[in-house]
Amino acid sequence: MLKIILIHIIKFYRKYISPLKKPCCRFYPTCSKYALDAINKYGAFKGSIMAIKRILRCHPFNPGGYDPVK
């Protein structure tokens, strides 16, 4: 149940909020796509933790690059 709610929140963000902002994610796939993949693969709790860690790494001092869900 929580997994479905989180997925809908991320999809809402990607559809309605993300287009209003300039592209700023330093990683591929984007942080929101990474969060969707992590939650789908590992579930709500572990996937959310992975997504939070990824978002915290997404800043101007990190070079970014290719970083898929493993």
UniProtKB/Swiss-Prot annotation:
Q: Which SMART domains match?
A: Haemolytic (SM01234)
Designated name of the protein: Putative membrane protein insertion efficiency factor
Major place of localization? membrane
The answer to whether the entry has keyword Electron transport is: no
Q: Tell me where it resides.
A: Cell membrane
Q: Which organism is it from?
A: Clostridium novyi (strain NT)
Its keywords, alphabetically, are: Cell membrane, Membrane
Please spell out the taxonomic lineage of the organism that makes this protein: Bacteria, Bacillati, Bacillota, Clostridia, Eubacteriales
- Which NCBIfam families is this protein grouped with? membrane protein insertion efficiency factor YidD (TIGR00278)
